[in-house]
Amino acid sequence: AKSQNNITLSVDVEKIPEMGFVISYLKESMIGMDFDAKGHAEYRIEDMDAIYLTLHNGFAEQKTIYAEKGDHIQLSFDGESMKKTLKMEGVRENIADYLKNVKISWPANKDFALDIKDFVKLLKEKVKENQQLLDSLTPALTKESSKFVKLEKNRIKYMLGLSLLDYPRMHPYMAKIEYTPGDDYYNELKAWLEEDLNSLCLSQYRTLMTEVPTFIMSRKTPIRTPYEKAMKQMEYINNNTKDEQVKQNLLTIIANNYIKDAGIQKSTELDAFYRKHVTDKELLAQYQQTYDSWAAVSPGQPAPDFKAVDISDKEFSLKDFKGKYVCLYLWPCVSPA
């Protein structure tokens, strides 16, 4: 059901896609849609005011759509080709058309041979170039969402800004010189960023706001483990972010992502740091939910019960595996995005 507090996505297909139908948003969120016997699936996104969603029809097709809190977007297609049969209801039509037509022009490899000052100058020109379509459509887009226009400007800016993270690796290769980033490089990194609470729904912004601290903190002392990386990121953000809401959100993003990836077994220092510096009740609740989900499956805890059906329709549950070894057959898949 539609709710003013979340974003709801409904999908109806004539035939369930053979390679699955997945939605992704942000960097860490990729959800496979679970269709019922009638070919219907539904998913709700909470705690997001606005979001860019990518629809993945297996590995063959992708489509980006935009949604805001309170939206109920209904999609339908034949289950084989989104391009030929996709119908959408509940989307903002002008924004949907813009996202269908916008193409991002990136710096060429040879551009990385420029010194950092000239490279940043070129990046800023690229940002303006890539915002031209948006600028030309701003009146029509603003009628549908004033929030989208500003958000899209920032999405383009931070998308191009990701090239700054590649510069230390690409510059010596393209310029055919030895190169160690100096103060000029790190100053440009910092200058590209702005503390903006509204941009936290952008994966590009999140990446830069969390990875730039990694670059800065590893300048003198190498960071060797994911745990060291998370701690250094949180330390830098806590000491250098002025906007308290932005700070606490970034700390939550880092802590949540680390716990999701690595669990809670070796997170005592991170957990204490997080709880000391984050006071927002909603953010604490998000983190606690992630923490508790891992605590439930940590070593020594009873295995959660489940029910599953094999290819012969025989039902299994946890008790059927008591005292037995279980072979897990995993398919390592990668996101095509």
Whereabouts are the PLM-identified features?
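Short coil/turn connectors between adjacent alpha-helices in alpha-solenoid helical repeat scaffolds
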Residues: 119-125, 166-178, 216-225, 257-265
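A non-transmembrane, solvent-exposed segment enriched in polar/low-complexity residues
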Residues: 3-151, 164-166, 173
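Structural signature of alpha-solenoid helical repeat junctions
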Residues: 145-155, 246, 283
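Conserved redox-active cysteine motifs that mediate thiol-disulfide chemistry
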Residues: 322-323, 327-337
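N-proximal helix/coil linker or "cap" segments that precede and/or mark the start of modular domains
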Residues: 245-310, 319-321
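Long, charge-rich alpha-helical interaction segments
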Residues: 199-259
